[in-house]
Amino acid sequence: MEISEARLTHLKELEAESIHIIREVAAEFDNPVMLYSIGKDSSVMLRLALKAFYPGTPPFPLMHVDTTWKFREMIAFRDRMARESGMELIVHINQEGVEQGIGPFTHGSKVHTDVMKTQSLKQAMDQHRFDAAFGGARRDEEKSRAKERVYSFRDRHHRWDPKGQRPELWQLYNGRVHKGESMRIFPLSNWTELDVWQYIYLEDIPIVPLYYAAERPVVDRDGTLIMVDDERMPLEEGEQPRYEKVRFRTLGCYPLTGAIRSEADTLPEIIQEMLLTRTSERQGRVIDHDSAGSMEEKKRQGYF
């Protein structure tokens, strides 16, 4: 697959901007952390962090907020990448949620996401006293993220106020925070899904195999193809998993992440397929459809 000179220049500019942001945060904040959700954006962000401090190791740890419902392949990939990067990996699980038996099937996506993701992240930020957290969100993903700054200020309760954002002129970022306050930092803000995939291709960045099309056991739930990843998934009466060739455009908790039928099992094929699609990559994320303005409300409460 050939990528034009103009696209290469564009990707190099994005790379330089992201590395600049990562270095700024490392220099400006006392205790930053990189949130590692194991998806393609996290993989790109990790590569940029490794480049930013090469030949040394990035001066901050990786942290994964584990809901206990991630795909098994994601967890295996997470542990492998942590070993290869040489970075410390913090895995945080909301034990209160586990003790209460919170899960996507028993309590629904809204409660599960709030307890096992949002509250869990806030616990981890407080426990480790992080004052900045890198995230892999991009502005092209979803409308609430489109209006979020690169440096996203969070108050003492980790809440985001979209009307109280700080100006960011000429790549100058205001990172001043008081004790207990923090910043969410998004180095990939100006990247698109196409940029991410082309960068993965050019840099030969490892990604979770779930992004590639393969025969997988799925059930159709209200038009969403859900992969049966383990024995915890309750099947409805008469429901039988069937093997179909599918892949995932986005990754999360397996009961809340829809697959797409696809034949794309190589990076060039994924990029070609992406160029022809007219739907958002987050179309398959059940949590984004809980209610109108669902993502913005989650972010106001402390979500990624």
Swiss-Prot record:
Primary enzyme class: transferase
InterPro entries: PAPS_reduct_dom, Rossmann-like_a/b/a_fold, SO4_adenylTrfase_ssu, Sulfate_adenylyltrnsfr_sub2
UniProtKB keywords: ATP-binding, Nucleotide-binding, Nucleotidyltransferase, Transferase
Gene3D superfamilies in alphabetical order: HUPs (3.40.50.620)
EC code: 2.7.7.4
One GO BP annotation of this record: sulfate assimilation
Nucleotide-binding is among the record's keywords: yes
GO molecular function: ATP binding; sulfate adenylyltransferase (ATP) activity
Pathway membership: Sulfur metabolism; hydrogen sulfide biosynthesis; sulfite from sulfate: step 1/3
Keyword Nucleotidyltransferase: yes
Pfam families: PAPS_reduct
Entry function: With CysN forms the ATP sulfurylase (ATPS) that catalyzes the adenylation of sulfate producing adenosine 5'-phosphosulfate (APS) and diphosphate, the first enzymatic step in sulfur assimilation pathway. APS synthesis involves the formation of a high-energy phosphoric-sulfuric acid anhydride bond driven by GTP hydrolysis by CysN coupled to ATP hydrolysis by CysD.
Subunit: Heterodimer composed of CysD, the smaller subunit, and CysN.
Family according to the record: Belongs to the PAPS reductase family. CysD subfamily.
PANTHER family cross-referenced by the UniProt entry: SULFATE ADENYLYLTRANSFERASE SUBUNIT 2 (PTHR43196:SF1)
Protein name (record): Sulfate adenylyltransferase subunit 2
Species of origin: Halorhodospira halophila (strain DSM 244 / SL1)
